[in-house]
């Protein structure tokens, strides 16, 4: 229909202009930043108190924050590449401090700076989807390869970050690795091999440490033990004070540890989701039945047990740290 007093060309021009304005409005609305001042002020005050009384703790929070942010970014990027549609990407938990929406995903920072997450719908075979959410955009709607890649992306990013941190530290130190002078990145393999050796040592020491927790005789002591947040903060502060090289090495150790822990096949860690996806894939290949599904919610009791054990190990490490300094 042509408006009164105009031509067909004017009508098309008007329709294009109106559509362009509508697109701009929608873009501005989707990218609108939401800020909650009260939680922002509360978070800043908490950080200020931490800096005043325990600056090492703030440095640890920063190190862990960067590692977790990159970990979750790995999940996010690969999930999109696999055809999934993430709906949330947040650093921290609790109330939102600042957030904005872009391409159907809400990004932001929350008040408790301990961790982060990417929200994917359809993580279980029977979970309900939001209205209008397509099945092919979900985690369960992706291919097995896509699901495995998405789950493993986070830990892999952490391990790559560790290798890079160790390599840069070695480069800055101007030393050698394995008796070979490191004049460039040609000897990066030595760093990767050293990272793998450190990982294996860490994993094999867990059993020894768990045994030492319940050993009341005091006759033996584990050569390696879990570090409580207190000792982690102390080491982080010392690394920062020592300079870039020590800081990079400690950052690499933390990143490597977080990646390794997430690879353990225990819910709610990434390794458990990877194990479920792999078992479904293998079962469907062997039985030639694409309807085979494993509901990760059946592993909830094991998830509670895992959390209980991790909290227990952390508390025991804290007790040992306090005992070392003469408290308790």
Segments from the language model and where they lie:
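Transmembrane alpha-helices
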Residues: 1, 16-58, 315
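Long, highly hydrophobic alpha-helical transmembrane signal-anchor segments
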Residues: 37-85, 221-250, 325-328
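Core segments of transmembrane alpha-helices
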Residues: 40-42, 155-162, 224-232, 306-310
């Amino acid at each position: 229909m042509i408006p009164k007093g105009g031509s067909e060309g004017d009508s098309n021009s008007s329709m294009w202009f109106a559509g362009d304005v509508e697109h701009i409005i929608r873009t501005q609305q989707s990218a609108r930043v939401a800020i909650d001042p009260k939680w922002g002020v509360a978070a800043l005050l908490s950080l200020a108190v931490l800096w005043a009384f325990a600056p090492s703790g703030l440095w640890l929070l920063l190190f862990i924050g960067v590692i977790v942010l990159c970990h979750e970014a790995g999940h996010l990027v690969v999930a999109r590449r696999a055809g999934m549609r993430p709906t949330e990407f947040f650093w921290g938990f609790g109330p939102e401090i600042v957030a904005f929406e872009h391409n159907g995903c809400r990004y932001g920072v929350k008040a408790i700076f301990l961790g982060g997450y990417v929200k994917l719908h359809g993580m279980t075979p029977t979970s309900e989807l939001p209205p209008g959410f397509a099945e092919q955009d979900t985690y369960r709607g992706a291919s097995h390869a896509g699901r495995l890649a998405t789950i493993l992306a986070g830990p892999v990013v952490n391990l790559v970050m560790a290798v890079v941190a160790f390599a840069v530290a070695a480069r800055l130190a101007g030393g050698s690795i394995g008796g070979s002078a490191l004049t460039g990145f040609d000897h990066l393999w030595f760093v990767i091999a050293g990272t793998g050796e450190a990982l294996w040592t860490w994993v094999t020491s867990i059993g020894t440490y768990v045994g030492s927790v319940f050993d009341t005789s005091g006759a033996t002591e584990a050569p390696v033990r879990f570090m409580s947040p207190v000792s982690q903060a102390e080491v982080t502060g010392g690394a920062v004070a020592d300079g870039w090289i020590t800081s990079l090495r400690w950052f690499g150790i933390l990143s490597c540890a977080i990646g390794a822990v997430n690879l353990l096949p225990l819910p709610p860690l990434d390794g458990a989701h990877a194990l479920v996806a792999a078992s479904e894939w293998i079962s469907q290949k062997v039985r030639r039945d694409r309807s085979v599904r494993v509901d990760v919610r059946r592993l909830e009791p094991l998830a509670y047990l895992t959390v209980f054990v991790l909290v227990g190990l952390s508390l025991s490490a804290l007790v040992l740290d306090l005992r070392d300094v003469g408290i308790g």
